[in-house]
Amino acid sequence: MLGAIAKKIFGSSNDRRVKGYRPRVAAINALEPEMEALSDEALRARTDALKAEVAAGKSLDDILVPAFATVREAAKRVLGQRHFDVQLIGGMVLHEGGIAEMKTGEGKTLVATLATYLNALAGQGVHVVTVNDYLARRDAEWMGRVYGFLGLSTGIIVHGLDDAERKAAYACDITYGTNNEYGFDYLRDNMKYELGQMVQRGHAFAIVDEVDSILIDEARTPLIISGPIDDRSDLYVAIDALMPRLAREDYDLDEKQRTVSLTESGNEHIEELLREAGVLREGDLYDAHNITIVHHVNQALRAHTLFTRDKDYIVRNDEVVIIDEFTGRMMPGRRYSEGLHQALEAKERVTIQPENQTLASITFQNYFRLYKKLAGMTGTASTEADEFQEIYNLGVVEIPTNRPVERVDEDDEVYRTAEEKYAAIIAEIDKAHARHQPVLVGTGSIERSEHIAALLERHGYRPLDYSNLSAMEEVYAAAREGRVTKRFAVLNARFHEQEAYIVAQAGVPGAITIATNMAGRGTDIKLGGNVEMRVAQELAEVPEGPERQARVDAIRREIDENRAQVLASGEPADPEAGRKSALPGGLYIVGTERNESRRIDNQLRGRSGRQGDPGRSKFYLSLQDDLMRIFGSDRMDGMLQKLGLEQGEAIIHPWINKAIAKAQQKVEARNFDMRKNVLKYDNVMNDQRKVVFEQRREFMAQESVRETVDEMRHGVVDDVVAQHIPEDAYPEQWDVAGLREAIGAQLNLDVPVEDWAKEEGIADEEIRDRLRKAADEGYAARVERNGPDLMAYVEKQVLLQSLDHLWREHLVTLDHLRQVIGWRGIAQRDPLNEYKSEAFELFNGLIGSLREQVTGQLMRIEIMMQEPEAPSLPPMFAQHLDPVTGENEFALPQGSGSFGGGGGAFGYAAQDLSADAAVLERDPTDASTWGRVGRNEPCPCGSGKKYKHCHGRFSGEA
């Protein structure tokens, strides 16, 4: 009560913050006459003048007012658009590293030009992040005209560019691209072997469009680059065939947590089925040697119980294509990892692609925290303000609309069954269509959007192809003549290519558009239709000239008339139905279910009522909807019965709205906790990733890594001596034979250690010093023999490739550790602390292994003179998603050189350095020449077995 009174008197904290920007807005407005008086050349020269001020020591804050005034005037001249005062405030919020929440249609794209231009003057590059390639191209070309007018360069990063094109785009003052492309470029850069091959030039400032979609919805989506491993398609097919034979009591399914597990009877049943099928040949299912079968069974079970065709994925062109749960978009090329995608392929009887191993990964949370300054824009951020502040240290500022919002958001209508709900939706669409009011029907999946489409067809409606010009002419003619067309369009992942055009024309009189979640669509729905889209479609072949201009003017007049018709399409008052006032015209949003997040619902509603236009929205629900069914449908059902709800009757009541809001808040809180938990664990890996990537970059930047190589060699000597001559041990306790053998194996040295140990009064320090000297002399002779310049090149390549190989193995180990560490909680130990501790020990082990591997290789390497050529990443990648977190991955193709499958450790005589100059000579009969052999490599003895099953069994490495 007191808080509400104080808010009324003093305003909210958001109001006070917005008020704080007003003086600078006034200062920018005061400069407008001066800017208008400048010639184009003089206005363009403002950029060089402002850059000079920054170079002279002024901060960007100091030049904000003149910079914003410059951009505003340039936009007026180039685009014919003038930044409103509230847009100037939005630009200031972005510049300060905050999130500007701006309603749909308020011009977020134009707002970004202000902060982008200002920060580009510092010369460190600005990254503008969008959700798809279409928006990246559109915004770069559209706003790039303003930047180009002012003398700044604009680049675009989209899928399919080569490294040279990417490097050129990143070198521009301003770069537009998608979150995936930026993240994968970062990972790929940290797999390069020369600084000159890297494409990104740093992470100074990023503006993230649809920031909630990228930093919240996709926060649990680690970007992963992976390489292929062994093909197990036969096993997937065999196990998939058994899934339909399981009974419902064989497994426990939790839809709320999206988990499924076999019951005790289910374990017995599946074991019996596996034996019948010849898959389980020996032992019990949970014996250690059958753990792979358990993994495949679990993934097949998940594929059949948790994932639904046309909701979670579609099948197209012999592929399983994932559907983004938040936007309804197809994600071609992305794949679930850990074998889940292969299980789905087996389920759908399409070609099964090979599994993959992680080579490099990072979450969006940690990628975007690399930027020195981060900002974002969206229409819906306030519901997630706490998460933005806690995770990213980003404050949310709600920017006032330029005109008041005139949309009417009606209360939800709740029905007992889905059938009753859909009948009410069709009836409502019928009524709106008869009034020529455009309707946008929002659904949660392809399956449901196509169900609505099928119902409409049963009621006499026909689907409409928006790319068919003659079909659209029918719609436009009907609008001109005041007729109804009974046509509708469907926008879902199946019609991805037509997306922008379908959305743009959803405001035509009488239009019916059925769409999966609208988050991140990025195209405004203008009442009456979209002039630019119609001109592009109808006048594509008409050359510039009077005729074209006349037709453009005619289209504008027609759309103005259509707009007036839409504005007048509201529903009149109906006192008999209890509605005393009329409902507005404009775009009518019909929601067919509530989403798990209030933010997604708000995004759907926000498609209507842009820039002060009238509009209305209403959600139709049933107790069979996913949200209602999973989160408290029993309680809700009882509530409806108490309220006297009969079959076929809807109810509208504040209790219902509150219960739904609470259910959504529960889901949001659960998802927030999951994202925080992912971040806590990923922070452990992220700290190690930073160390490895920074060290790697240092190695590449150094002209020579000889000093590092020498230190590593000395470290190996110290480790070997410490291992065989314990501290404070008597000489007779020394393992001299073991020391000599280890020195031969790891340093390729033959030294008289036994004779040294017999010398009177000799200490372990003396032996260590002699071994260091012998190793240094042996290596110096190798350098002299092969040439110092060539050895310097080989040293760097061996160091980088060894680091990459060990880091890949380390990622796999950490992933396995993370999967099982939760069991420590049973022993009353904190799994996170246990993970941190063990990950630290593993990282120390990685450092030790790096010393051994680099030293062992270089102490044996022989050079055959060939033209050196630095290894590079293969050109083709495929993306992958984690089954639980929705992880993004890039997979390298089979047979892709040093990054492809197989190979294990560095047997790079024929593999990793074959294109360079280093060749390692291994004698099959002399194990001392083998160096470090990967556990899964073919044994160098020539037996044909893997090393771990041959000589590795005796070396202690297996």
UniProtKB/Swiss-Prot annotation:
GO terms for biological process: intracellular protein transmembrane transport; protein import; protein targeting; protein transport by the Sec complex. It comes from the Bacteria. Part of the Sec protein translocase complex. Interacts with the SecYEG preprotein conducting channel. Has a central role in coupling the hydrolysis of ATP to the transfer of proteins into and across the cell membrane, serving both as a receptor for the preprotein-SecB complex and as an ATP-driven molecular motor driving the stepwise translocation of polypeptide chains across the membrane. It catalyses: ATP + H2O + cellular proteinSide 1 = ADP + phosphate + cellular proteinSide 2. SMART domains: SecA_DEAD, SecA_PP_bind. Monomer and homodimer. Part of the essential Sec protein translocation apparatus which comprises SecA, SecYEG and auxiliary proteins SecDF-YajC and YidC. CDD domains: DEXDc_SecA, SF2_C_secA. Zn(2+) binds at C939, C941, C950, H951. Residues 598-617 are annotated as: Disordered. ATP binds at Q87, G105, E106, G107, K108, T109, D524. Its main location: membrane. It is found in: Cell inner membrane; Cytoplasm. It comes from Methylobacterium sp. (strain 4-46). May bind 1 zinc ion per subunit. GO terms for cellular component: cell envelope Sec protein transport complex; cytosol; plasma membrane. Belongs to the SecA family. The gene is secA. This is Protein translocase subunit SecA. Its EC number is 7.4.2.8. Its cofactor is Zn(2+). PANTHER family: CHLOROPLAST PROTEIN-TRANSPORTING ATPASE, SECA INNER MEMBRANE COMPONENT OF SEC PROTEIN SECRETION SYSTEM. It is a peripheral membrane protein. GO terms for molecular function: ATP binding; metal ion binding; protein-exporting ATPase activity. Pfam families: P-loop_SecA, SEC-C, SecA_DEAD, SecA_PP_bind, SecA_SW.
